[in-house]
């Protein structure tokens, strides 16, 4: 479910040494399965453990996950990274905003999952997003761009060289992608 690197475990171990005996960590998702999902880590003293919690035992620490957050923390990773500028704890949870979809799920759901968990986080850096509108009978994924992608001069490149390549690689049953957005250049456009 969650991978916690050795560096992160060492970091937590130092922090937990200053807490009440028996305290571990809790990993959670607020607003799971929504675009507003946020992940967090907090202390979990012994009296805060719920019967429905999942206990993840690692080499140096244990982590508790509440029942609601668990499916959204699938494939999550916590790391502690140190570089010339300092150090920081990172929590990557690719399924926090959308529950992981099974390989046997309908094509529409699998494509939507990839868009939401892999493509849109990249587009969000430019204030953009893409939505799957439909998959045609001839295998075309019809997409609509929004935010900073609407009217962006790089949208064709993003569509063909980024999104289409990634989707065709993951879903050989697709034949291509098409953009149905009525692009209007404005202050919202990234380029």
UniProtKB/Swiss-Prot annotation:
The gene is nfuA. Homodimer. Keywords: 4Fe-4S, Iron, Iron-sulfur, Metal-binding. It holds the Pfam family Fe-S_biosyn. InterPro entries: Fe/S_biogenesis_protein_NfuA, FeS_biogenesis, FSCA_dom_sf, HesB-like_dom_sf, NIF_FeS_clus_asmbl_NifU_C. Its cofactor is [4Fe-4S] cluster. Binds 1 [4Fe-4S] cluster per subunit. The cluster is presumably bound at the interface of two monomers. GO terms for biological process: iron-sulfur cluster assembly; protein maturation. The keyword Iron-sulfur applies. Belongs to the NfuA family. The keyword rRNA-binding does not apply. GO terms for molecular function: 4 iron, 4 sulfur cluster binding; iron ion binding. [4Fe-4S] cluster binds at residues 149, 152. It comes from Pectobacterium carotovorum subsp. carotovorum (strain PC1). This is Fe/S biogenesis protein NfuA. Involved in iron-sulfur cluster biogenesis. Binds a 4Fe-4S cluster, can transfer this cluster to apoproteins, and thereby intervenes in the maturation of Fe/S proteins. Could also act as a scaffold/chaperone for damaged Fe/S proteins. Disulfide bonds: none annotated. NCBIfam families: PRK11190.1, YhgI_GntY.
């Amino acid at each position: 479910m969650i991978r916690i690197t050795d560096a992160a475990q060492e970091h937590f171990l130092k922090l937990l040494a200053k807490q009440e005996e028996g305290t571990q960590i809790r990993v959670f998702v607020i607003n799971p399965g929504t675009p507003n999902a946020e992940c967090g880590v907090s202390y979990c003293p012994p009296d805060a453990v719920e019967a429905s919690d999942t206990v993840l035992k690692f080499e140096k620490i244990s982590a508790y996950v509440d029942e609601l957050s668990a499916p959204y923390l699938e494939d999550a990773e916590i790391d502690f990274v140190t570089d010339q500028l300092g150090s920081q704890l990172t929590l990557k949870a690719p399924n926090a905003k959308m529950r992981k979809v099974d390989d046997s799920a309908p094509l529409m759901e699998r494509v939507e999952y990839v868009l939401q968990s892999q493509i849109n986080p990249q587009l969000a850096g430019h204030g953009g997003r893409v939505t799957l509108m439909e998959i045609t009978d001839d295998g075309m994924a019809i997409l609509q761009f929004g935010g900073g992608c609407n009217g962006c001069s790089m949208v064709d490149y993003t569509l063909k060289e980024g999104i289409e390549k990634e989707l065709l690689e993951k879903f050989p049953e697709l034949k291509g992608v098409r953009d149905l957005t009525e692009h209007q250049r404005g202050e919202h456009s990234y380029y």
